[in-house]
Amino acid sequence: MERRWPLGLALLLLLLCAPLPPGARAEEVTLMDTSTAQGELGWLLDPPETGWSEVQQMLNGTPLYMYQDCPIQEGGDTDHWLRSNWIYRGEEASRIYVELQFTVRDCKSFPGGAGPLGCKETFNLFYMESDQDVGIQLRRPLFQKVTTVAADQSFTIRDLASGSVKLNVERCSLGHLTRRGLYLAFHNPGSCVALVSVRVFYQRCAETVHGLAHFPDTLPGPGGLVEVAGTCLSHAQISLGSSGTPRMHCSPDGEWLVPVGQCQCEPGYEESSGNVGCTACPTGFYRVDMNTLRCLKCPQHSIAESEGSTICTCENGHYRAPGEGPQVACTRPPSAPQNLSFSTSGTQLSLRWEPPRDTGGRHDIRYSVECLQCRGIAQDGGPCQPCGKGVHFSPAASGLTTSTVQVQGLEPYANYTFTVKSQNRVSGLDSSSPSSASLSINMGHAESLSGLSLKLVKKEPRQLELTWAGSRPRNPGGNLSYELHVLNQDEEWHQMVLEPRVLLTKLQPDTTYIVRVRTLTPLGPGPFSPDHEFRTSPPVSRSLTGGEIVAVIFGLLLGIALLIGIYVFRSRRGQRQRQQRQRERTTNVDREDKLWLKPYVDLQAYEDPAQGALDFAQELDPAWLIVDTVIGEGEFGEVYRGALRLPSQDCKTVAIKTLKDTSPDGYWWNFLREATIMGQFNHPHILRLEGVITKRKPIMIITEFMENGALDAFLKEREDQLAPGQLVAMLLGIASGMNCLSGHNYVHRDLAARNILVNQNLCCKVSDFGLTRLLDDFDGTYETQGGKIPIRWTAPEAIAHRIFTTASDVWSFGIVMWEVLSFGDKPYGEMSNQEVMKSIEDGYRLPPPVDCPAPLYELMKNCWAYDRARRPHFLQLQAHLEQLLTDPHSLRTIANFDPRVTLRLPSLSGSDGIPYRSVSEWLESIRMKRYILHFRSAGLDTMECVLELTAEDLTQMGITLPGHQKRILCSIQGFKD
């Protein structure tokens, strides 16, 4: 009987021209593929004559071998088997895949419509494992069924004629194989089928490079993921912070999954293009450590002569100061001060000079002054010695930052040589002496007493004893004396003395005298000192009589008795008040001790959340509560202002937070969690919980009422109305509250100005504990599985890995500081969340707000350290803010504003070099929008008009604050640069 189909060759041609499916991503290792066979397959047929048959078709000059079977015309049950040759599996893969390409004819397409009796459209796949080839014995009972193969699409004669026959592809897997090889068998129960190709293969994870680590070819395991350790590429090391050797996991499908850890290029190398290796830094570039992403160009006056440098060495004559890193430019000592000059007033000398012409590339120049006293003229070689302790320099003789110094205590008739040296932090590293300028001075003949004061030693009705500070001549033969000029309303006279001391006699009692003094030298008199007034004593009074003495004594005794009575009365009243205060303190302490003795817990530990809340909060009677106006609302509840009147207590204003009955269960849980957390604290800077209502709907949380509301809105309404000291005090309160939270192992996770409340005394309190969680310990972490994250306030590690710690709250506190100092501005302006995340990863940090004190901005930057271990703790932040509050002068230094760092606005399509299209847009970006009307009034409507503005122009426009002028002019200079 003919076993081939009608039109079989045409059908095969259509099948051979059909497209093959794309390959899988995993690497596939083929064990057998009939489509690539170079000769007849020679598979075992059973029965050999009437069952399956092998056909050959030429395609592009290459023979293609396949099997077909169509026993439809035979009638009755069909039992045709086709067995493959032995397929060697080896010792590697425990799972293999079988891919079949075949076609099946639709039974309804045969004559008669319903199809011949026994016609089917499926066939069966079997397999048998063996360690060797068993020959031509079929051994049907030893085969195990894999699956019944059904066609997704069958064809008809009409499909064949129109060329629309499509190829079916079936893929199945055989797992847990243990023998060295196997056979495949195909059982046809009565379908008209063509087996075009059979491919047997296994999958493996291909050799790859990930995170600068090499991972070899890896076979999947019998089940689950296989962990594979990688090897760092050449010149790469395990990344800082990684938990060990980089690892990836090979999945059963041959794909690499779940990378853990990575490698980084070692110092002196950077990632090559495509991140497939490490290349050495070229000459002139360096990479100092693994925290630096790329090779950096050598700073000014430093060189890297070889590739792969980790540091750039300074050029000859240039140095780095101690503590300066390799990223700092090399500098040199300054040149000598210029134009050293002096002026004298008596024996007081004023030295002045100008800064060095060459500063050496540094701004930390300090000056020191040396003084030598010489006999004769120093230039003529006269002997000189250092000036004695009597010579004083104001403000100091060394460490001067200004270019002037006052010298006092010099001797008349003496020659002095003053040397002014200019130094910076690298001067000590240079072998040569510091550059200096010298000046020789002759103090002349006269001594001035203009800066001295006459002092009264003793006075009597007819005598005055006076003294003053004088000098003794050092040169031989130099005689000094003093002339006094004394006068009153009736007379005046001059008196000569040899010592700086005089006793004036024969004066009038109870009379004022004006006295001044000057020195007399062989070259003439010096100038007079300022006038001083002295008054003699009144004449001695007569003696008291006996009666007067008795009256005085009686009055004294009466006064003493009165004072004793007042003292006894006040002492008793103070004792009663102290006892009352002690009783009150004892009561308060007992109440607080009961509160603080409660363990800090999370609501998660309770099966009934309502019961957990009541363990830390008082259940209030709704009758005690008066609900007033709505002060806030959200999707699942409202916040009201109301009044609470507890039994036997005065009525007080409270805030009432409600939860709608229709809220999801998760919100109900978090609602009670927030009450539980607040109830565990009694801190002046954490919102105080008054009680809860859980036994009636809606559920309510009652807290103290904060008159000024949320901090961000409060600051916007009072822009520039609060002094820096007030802002620091508010930040100190927030830091104190957060220190209390973190000290008890809580992480807030949503610290922002909108969640800080302000009362009428400007006291800030931390609130909104909906996202707050309890950590296992102080250094613990909390890992969330989902939910929204406030990107602009959240630390980078919390965004990337959803891991929250106290350090991530410190990052958020730095953003709150920025909000406070900018009076409620939005962090990062109009940047999108994606831009914010990328900018932070690139090292961008918020610029200082307008007029931000430099110490506060430094504190912000410390909070924004990328490495969370480098961020300060809240206790350190609290101490630092307390120190700033006690030293208000430190807040006068304003943080430098970099004009190149501005917050991007939506439109950046200005003219070339000016990334703003309007003046108002530019002023907003540098936080100077308050001056928009000033610019409009001055007719400055375009950005080109502002490029030539000067400080005088700004003053005429009404912009007079120096800090604001500096910010505007720096931004304009940034456009020009």
From Swiss-Prot:
Membrane topology: Single-pass type I membrane protein
Assigned keywords, A-Z: Angiogenesis, ATP-binding, Cell adhesion, Cell membrane, Glycoprotein, Kinase, Membrane, Nucleotide-binding, Phosphoprotein, Receptor, Repeat, Signal, Transferase, Transmembrane, Transmembrane helix, Tyrosine-protein kinase, Ubl conjugation
SUPFAM superfamilies: Fibronectin type III, Galactose-binding domain-like, Growth factor receptor domain, Protein kinase-like (PK-like), SAM/Pointed domain
Signal peptide as annotated in the record: 1-26
Enzyme Commission no: 2.7.10.1
InterPro entries: Eph_TM (IPR027936), EphA1_rcpt_lig-bd (IPR034251), Ephrin_rcpt_lig-bd_dom (IPR001090), Ephrin_rcpt_TKs (IPR050449), FN3_dom (IPR003961), FN3_sf (IPR036116), Galactose-bd-like_sf (IPR008979), Growth_fac_rcpt_cys_sf (IPR009030)
Residues that carry a glycan: N415, N479
Keyword Metal-binding assigned: no
Domain Eph LBD: 28-210
Top EC class for this record: transferase
CC annotations in GO: plasma membrane
Tissues showing expression: Preferentially expressed in epithelial cells including skin, kidney, liver and thymus. Expressed in myogenic progenitor cells.
Modified-residue entries (Phosphotyrosine), positions: Y600, Y606, Y782
Ranges for domain Protein kinase: 625-885
Residue ranges occupied by any Fibronectin type-III domain in the UniProt entry: 333-446, 448-539
Catalytic activity entry: L-tyrosyl-[protein] + ATP = O-phospho-L-tyrosyl-[protein] + ADP + H(+)
PTMs per UniProt: Phosphorylated. Autophosphorylation is stimulated by its ligand EFNA1.
Motif residue range(s): PDZ-binding: 975-977
Ranges of the Extracellular topological domain: 27-548
GO biological process: angiogenesis; cell surface receptor protein tyrosine kinase signaling pathway; negative regulation of cell migration; positive regulation of angiogenesis; positive regulation of cell migration; positive regulation of cell-matrix adhesion; positive regulation of stress fiber assembly; substrate adhesion-dependent cell spreading
Residues that bear Phosphoserine: S907, S911
Family: Belongs to the protein kinase superfamily. Tyr protein kinase family. Ephrin receptor subfamily.
Known partners and oligomeric status: Homodimer. Forms a signaling complex with LCK; PTK2B/PYK2 and PI3-kinase upon activation by EFNA1; regulates T-lymphocytes migration. Interacts (via SAM domain) with ILK (via ANK repeats); stimulated by EFNA1 but independent of the kinase activity of EPHA1. Interacts (kinase activity-dependent) with PTK2/FAK1.
Protein name: Ephrin type-A receptor 1
Lineage: Eukaryota, Metazoa, Chordata, Craniata, Vertebrata
